[in-house]
Amino acid sequence: MARTVFCEYLKQEAEGLDFQLYPGELGKRIFDSISKQAWSEWIKKQTMLVNEKKLSMMNAEHRKLLETEMVNFLFEGKEVQIEGYVPVEQK
């Protein structure tokens, strides 16, 4: 049976992550209070950020920026702003 959490992002009970995906205390907080669906939405935003801003995970400043954006997105309800990104019109 899948574990459920009260997802802070979705503001409802949802299927939790299978294991801790991020290290440290922040990783424990994510595991305890973020759903698979919310994490999946974050991964899409993270990919866009890395690609559009040409971030390198070898750069500590870039990793810190991503972590800040992740906390803002998952826990504070702030949308990720990606300069120059224009969504494709859906038909």
UniProtKB/Swiss-Prot annotation:
Gene3D superfamilies: Fe(II) trafficking protein YggX. This is Probable Fe(2+)-trafficking protein. GO terms for cellular component: cytosol. GO terms for biological process: cellular response to oxidative stress. Keywords: Iron. It comes from Actinobacillus pleuropneumoniae serotype 5b (strain L20). Could be a mediator in iron transactions between iron acquisition and iron-requiring processes, such as synthesis and/or repair of Fe-S clusters in biosynthetic enzymes. Belongs to the Fe(2+)-trafficking protein family. InterPro entries: Fe_traffick_prot_YggX, Fe_traffick_prot_YggX_sf. It comes from the Bacteria. Pfam families: Iron_traffic (PF04362). The keyword Signal does not apply. GO terms for molecular function: iron ion binding.
